[in-house]
Amino acid sequence: MSTRLGDLVERLGGRLIGDADIEVVGIAPLGDADASHITFLSNPKLRGQAAQTRAAALILSAADDEIVAANYQGARIVADNPYAYFARAAQLFAALHAYVAPAGIHPTASVDPQAKVAASASIGPHVTVEAGAIIENACVIDAGCFIGRNARIGAATHFYPRVTFLAGCSIGQRGIVHPGAVIGADGFGFANEGGAWIKIPQTGAVSIGDDVEIGANTSIDRGALADTVIEDGVKLDNQIQIGHNCHIGAHTAMAGCVGVAGSAVIGKYCTFGGAAMVLGHLTIADRVHISSGSLVSRSIKEPGQYTGFYPLAKNAEWEKSAVIVRNLAAMREKIREMEKTIKSLGDEQE
């Protein structure tokens, strides 16, 4: 299925330079695109490749357009943020070509009579939906998912196969949860008495907002007393662990294998590189960016980029320290030579 460039720009904005009636079927990289595709330029280093692309149309910034236009003969869509424009265009084409799951409940699914499933929802093979669960309009629950008692799934949310969504948990509209994710397992809560561990019942749940995406095999534990909270627009990659009673602010994004210990409070618009770790009961301000592999061992009160294993510091400070650490061996040798020189001067004076 194709779409006109003019219709695309009318829907997404931007300034079209060229034939509005050109039909395109999708988006492709600069080097792979042909006359049936549009492509995009978001990295100025690829201007030369953009000028040679065979794509029917090129999404680019005004600054890049001034340079590329002389050598590129196709249509151009000038956008303030070409990468974001590409993302929205990709969503549009994905929707055009997407498989539409049929509404209804598969014969092998087990849906409790006290559950409420919207007529427009799609419940796949071998899904279990327990009593009191609510599944709203246009949801897609793929094969093998488990929806616990009194759970709530907002409209147009998609659970891929084998998602486990336990009792009392909720997710808002337009959520995406990938295979193997576990939402609402018990948090790691124990009291120590004489060296033995006493389990603390985890009676809270997990409350997830709208437009949240959760990666494959990611785990979000239920709260001990109050809920674990994931606000609107949060994006979680694969194999992330969110401990009990954490609160993740809106539009924060975490790459794979991030670990957040219990009761940590993370602000809005933060980012975490892969395998970053956050200790429990810490507070992180809005717009904090944690580099990959960093250990956050103290609360962070100011926005900015932070890097390091121990101690954590602002990125610029950490880079300076890293240079010093790298040169410690050479500095030690220089100090030894200086000590020898000073000693020899002292011997001569004697």
Swiss-Prot record:
Pathway: Bacterial outer membrane biogenesis; LPS lipid A biosynthesis. The keyword GTP-binding does not apply. GO terms for cellular component: membrane. The active site is at H244. Its EC number is 2.3.1.191. It catalyses: a UDP-3-O-[(3R)-3-hydroxyacyl]-alpha-D-glucosamine + a (3R)-hydroxyacyl-[ACP] = a UDP-2-N,3-O-bis[(3R)-3-hydroxyacyl]-alpha-D-glucosamine + holo-[ACP] + H(+). Keywords: Acyltransferase, Lipid A biosynthesis, Lipid biosynthesis, Lipid metabolism, Repeat, Transferase. Signal peptide: none annotated. It comes from the Bacteria. GO terms for molecular function: N-acyltransferase activity. GO terms for biological process: lipid A biosynthetic process. Catalyzes the N-acylation of UDP-3-O-acylglucosamine using 3-hydroxyacyl-ACP as the acyl donor. Is involved in the biosynthesis of lipid A, a phosphorylated glycolipid that anchors the lipopolysaccharide to the outer membrane of the cell. NCBIfam families: lipid_A_lpxD, PRK00892.1. Homotrimer. Belongs to the transferase hexapeptide repeat family. LpxD subfamily. This is UDP-3-O-acylglucosamine N-acyltransferase. It comes from Herminiimonas arsenicoxydans. The lineage of its organism: Bacteria, Pseudomonadati, Pseudomonadota, Betaproteobacteria, Burkholderiales.
